[in-house]
Curated annotation (Swiss-Prot):
Transmembrane annotation, as ranges: 6-26
Gene Ontology cellular-component annotations: chloroplast thylakoid membrane
InterPro entries the record matches: PSII_PsbN (IPR003398)
Protein name: Protein PsbN
Native organism taxonomy: Eukaryota, Viridiplantae, Chlorophyta, Mamiellophyceae, Mamiellales
Membrane topology, as annotated: Single-pass membrane protein
Family of the protein in this entry: Belongs to the PsbN family.
GO-annotated biological processes: photosynthesis
Pfam families: PsbN (PF02468)
Keyword Transcription belongs to the record: no
Length: 44
């Protein structure tokens, strides 16, 4: 019983780290060049 809780914790930790890493890659990596900036589109 204690062993399965440990593996669930490790799985959730790895999932959190991978989602965070992917978000940083999309936000600041090479794919960020394709993102649009709504503030630059509507400048007065």
């Amino acid at each position: 019983m204690e062993n399965s809780a440990f593996f669930y914790g490790v799985f959730l930790w790895c999932l959190l780290i991978s989602v965070t890493g992917y978000s940083i890659y999309i936000g600041f990596g090479p794919p960020s060049k394709e993102l649009r900036d709504p503030f630059e589109e509507h400048e007065d």
